[in-house]
Amino acid sequence: MAKGAREKIRLNSSAGTGHFYTTTKNKRTMPEKMEIKKFDPVVRQHVIYKEGKIK
């Protein structure tokens, strides 16, 4: 089977709580860094999550 184009990424909270989500994205169709608004349960608000590397 061929290797997929999807790569695992980590979405870090911009609120500084240390909370994160993990997801995948296609690097060929979305080469820029992802920013998405999601719920942060630590501050109990919707905040912007920015893409970071999985260690």
Curated annotation (Swiss-Prot):
Organism from which the protein derives: Tolumonas auensis (strain DSM 9187 / NBRC 110442 / TA 4)
Name of protein: Large ribosomal subunit protein bL33
Name of the encoding gene: rpmG
Family per record: Belongs to the bacterial ribosomal protein bL33 family.
Record's compositionally biased regions (Basic and acidic residues): 1-10
One Gene Ontology term, aspect cellular component: cytosolic large ribosomal subunit
InterPro entries: Ribosomal_bL33, Ribosomal_bL33_CS, Ribosomal_bL33_sf, Ribosomal_zn-bd
Biological process per Gene Ontology, one example term: translation
Superkingdom in the source lineage: Bacteria
Annotated keywords: Ribonucleoprotein, Ribosomal protein
Cross-referenced NCBIfam families: PRK00595.1, rpmG_bact
Disordered: annotated segments: 1-23
Stretches with biased composition (Polar residues): 11-23
Presence of the UniProt keyword 4Fe-4S in the record: no
Alphabetized GO MF terms: structural constituent of ribosome
